[in-house]
Amino acid sequence: VLGAAFFAIPNIACKIIGILLLFLWFIMDCSDGEVARYTQTFSRYGKEIDYLAHILDHPCVNLSMWYTYVQISTYNIYIISALFITLISAELITRNLIIMEVYDKDKKAKNDKVFKPSWMKWLFLQIVYFPNIVLFLPIIILGDYVGLYNSSYILAFIVAANLLNTANMYRKTLKKCYKAL
């Protein structure tokens, strides 16, 4: 949340500090689960806190990126707002679908096949899953903020890819639910 707050401040130094704090958040977010797995100390409380942190952090980061686009004042605020509302909504739906799938897998046997996507699917998933967006989109927006290029096309592509991924996940979830009936 602190990284998002710094990124929202209309100052280039604050935006760079915000990006660095977002990278630090990402490292800490990844490492807490790894430490739990390594030490074999899992708790339901830890999972819930991690989930709650994502529910709070992700919209805050999206709002800070949206506010930076508003500060650029080159783009139509309604289109940018619609893109970010769509991105936040798709991300929250995706997060809930992932959690539903994780809880469903916890109930099943552990000897199921491991999903290994093709390299193109893997690359697509890296682009659309939110923590990865936090790593590259603020840097791209920063380039737009200082006037190097127009990043709205990249934003539109990311939103479209997120919508496709969310729709696909939702379709698969519905298919599983109807098969269970």
Identify the role of each PLM range.
Residues V1-F6, I19, Y38-R95:
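Multi-pass membrane catalytic core of lipid/isoprenoid biosynthesis enzymes
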Residues V1-Y45, L148-V159:
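Membrane-embedded alpha-helical segments that form the functional core of polytopic membrane enzymes
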Residues R95-L181:
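C-terminal membrane-associated helical module and adjoining short loops/tails
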Residues P10-K15, M28-S31, L56-H58, N62, ...:
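Hydrophobic alpha-helical transmembrane segments of membrane proteins
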Residues L2, L24-G33, T74-L83, L97-K110:
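Hydrophobic alpha-helical transmembrane segments
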Residues L22-M28, F84-L92, F157-N165:
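Alpha-helical transmembrane segments of multi-pass membrane proteins
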Residues A5-I9, S31, L63-V70, A90-L97, ...:
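Structural signature of transmembrane alpha-helix termini at the membrane-water interface
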Residues A8-I12, Y38-F42, W66-S73, M100-K107, ...:
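Transmembrane helix-loop junctions in multipass membrane proteins, especially transporters and channels
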